[in-house]
Amino acid sequence: MHPSGGALSVPPGFRFHPTDEELLYYYLRKKVAYEAIDLDVIREIDLNKLEPWDLKDRCRIGTGPQNEWYFFSHKDKKYPTGTRTNRATTAGFWKATGRDKAIFLANACRIGMRKTLVFYVGRAPHGKKTDWIMHEYRLDQDNVDVQEDGWVVCRVFMKKSYQRGLNPADMAAVDDDDLLHHHHHPFPPAQLHGGAADHKHDGAGGHHHHHLMQPHHHYDDFPSFDPSMQLPQLMSADQPPPPPPSLLPGGTASSLQRLPLQYLGCEAADLLRFSK
């Protein structure tokens, strides 16, 4: 049983970062089949009664940093005979974006679909777009031996967390649809992107998805730069390239260290081979 409110109790150090496949084939499949889930940490939520920012408290797991939130919810048809789903809340509404993505098991068997939605504040069709993103997962009824009764499992996060650390030019090159349909990593976005720990998808939700902390770089692993060291001059377009070391008098493989910069990289292996 879930407590009525507050964080779900989990062992110290527990972090919940399921993959798309795990959400569908383990958690949602067991849910619709009324099977027990070993560690039941996904709450049931009425999506129409909660705003995305309320999920941070309602769906908290443990006491550690968290920047994406998970819950089960019923698909609520907007019209009795229609196929459109009502995802309106008091403050706004969730709007589907892009194309649904098929989710496959390792054996190439399709088990379900992932729909991406963006939260808008206000009333359709004139709402204001926010950074809150939701991935809604549904099972393929043809591929499971259970009766799907309207349950879906959802992951909510904030888009901004995935853009932290990018310069303006890089951010401009990011396509919204690619961002929203990012592959979810089994590690928290906090380890994959830079960001603040409580937003996640930073204030906007991340998959993201995770409130990001700046990734830890081991700068000690990089050689120190000596300002007195002279770098080789890049050759001009009019200057012919020098011959490989083996063609020079007394040339050896160690001569590679004195080659111009354009010889470093993928060509270096060929030059080493020629010099033998």
Swiss-Prot record:
GO-annotated molecular function: DNA binding
Region Disordered, annotated ranges: 180-253
UniProt remark on domains: The NAC domain includes a DNA binding domain and a dimerization domain.
Biased composition (Basic residues): 206-216
Keyword terms of this UniProt record: DNA-binding, Nucleus, Stress response, Transcription, Transcription regulation
Protein name: NAC domain-containing protein 76
Organism: Oryza sativa subsp. japonica (Rice)
Function: Probable transcription factor involved in stress response.
InterPro entries from the UniProt entry: NAC-dom, NAC_dom_sf
SUPFAM superfamilies reported in the protein's UniProt record: NAC domain
